[in-house]
Amino acid sequence: MERRLFTSESVSEGHPDKVADQISDAILDAMLEKDPNSHVACETIVTTGMVFVFGEISTNAYVDIQDVVRKTILRIGYDRPELGFDGNNCAVMVDIDEQSPDIAGGVDHSLETRENESDQDELDQIGAGDQGLMFGFAIKETPELMPLPISLAHRLMRRVASLRKDHTLDWLRPDAKAQVTVEYDENNNPLRVDTVVISTQTDAEVSNKEIRRAMIDLVIKEVIPARYLDEKTKFLINPSGRFVIGGPKGDSGLTGRKIIVDTYGGYARHGGGAFSGKDSTKVDRSASYAARYVAKNIVAAGLAYRCEVQLAYAIGVAHPVSIMIDTAGTGKVDDDLLTEAVRHVFDLRPAGIIKMLDLRRPIYEQTAAYGHFGRTDVDLSWEKTDKTQDLLDYIKNNK
């Protein structure tokens, strides 16, 4: 097998699509803080001088949405007019409806409880908020069990943001993107980094030479382990030649447009559903988190080198319609036995996921930039590996 290249990208918190994601999740968190049972589907558009928040929300909480929007924008770093977008004076428009009663009926009273009125299992009460398929993935390429390309891309973006916020590089602006191409050997092990692309918004005065030096010396070489860099590694720094106009002034942003950045950088499959702005009754989000939790525990238990999990749901139904485990031939036991173990160890009904991962908390804004998985900078319940022994015990007793 020939060596191959694989590329993943990340974007900064100041990227317009990520600004929208963070606003949607900040609103979700504000709702959950006051009413943990809020049903939220919140979308955001950002463009030059304007934010538009819309969607369907059912809650007992009162939240000053305009205030949440402005505080989020200012936290990201758009805090003065010369950046082309300013949380202090941008227009904020809000158009929120209540959740459809047809959807709410299926969520609050699952098909299982409607067909069997004597069903007293509280975890059967909540039906999935929609149909759909969700994937989770884990692989032993990094300590956090993530693919190396997306892991490095996220770390590059966090480093650029850190240098901006601590004023080490005062000429940096909030918008940025990174892309990392990794070369794999014939056994699919990471061999080296072939190409690094960083495009970062700057002020107009800094020279391209200074930008390049800073990105290579203070970002790339600080983030990417030296063993992956060699004399053939290519560094493409602001290759367009100029990146001064950025953020929502340069491009409009919309919630849910960076779903590959949010997950595994294209290394694993994706069901198509976005995460931000959605409460945990939306299986697009909660089941994707659960699938990652399952996959990570399988790999952490030493049961496979890599693992992809697919879950699928029907609207208004509590139990998943399918569970699939695929270890791509790296499993220590048969994938069918792993699937049995997963059904035994993990409760993958929506209410079971919510309880297992404690998802009614205001924890989501921190996930809306730099990825939802493999995070080492925040504490996320779906990143824990506390089910490994349960999996091993089931496998041992059922071989």
Curated annotation (Swiss-Prot):
Question: Record keywords: Magnesium included?
Answer: yes
Q: Which reaction does it catalyse?
A: L-methionine + ATP + H2O = S-adenosyl-L-methionine + phosphate + diphosphate
List positions binding Mg(2+). D17
Chain residues that bind L-methionine? E56, Q99, D251, K282
Subunit structure, as described in the record: Homotetramer; dimer of dimers.
PANTHER family reported for this sequence? S-ADENOSYLMETHIONINE SYNTHETASE
Functionally, this protein is described as follows:
Catalyzes the formation of S-adenosylmethionine (AdoMet) from methionine and ATP. The overall synthetic reaction is composed of two sequential steps, AdoMet formation and the subsequent tripolyphosphate hydrolysis which occurs prior to release of AdoMet from the enzyme.
**Name of the protein:** S-adenosylmethionine synthase
What organism is listed for this UniProt entry? Lactobacillus helveticus (strain DPC 4571)
> Organism classification, top ranks?
Bacteria, Bacillati, Bacillota, Bacilli, Lactobacillales
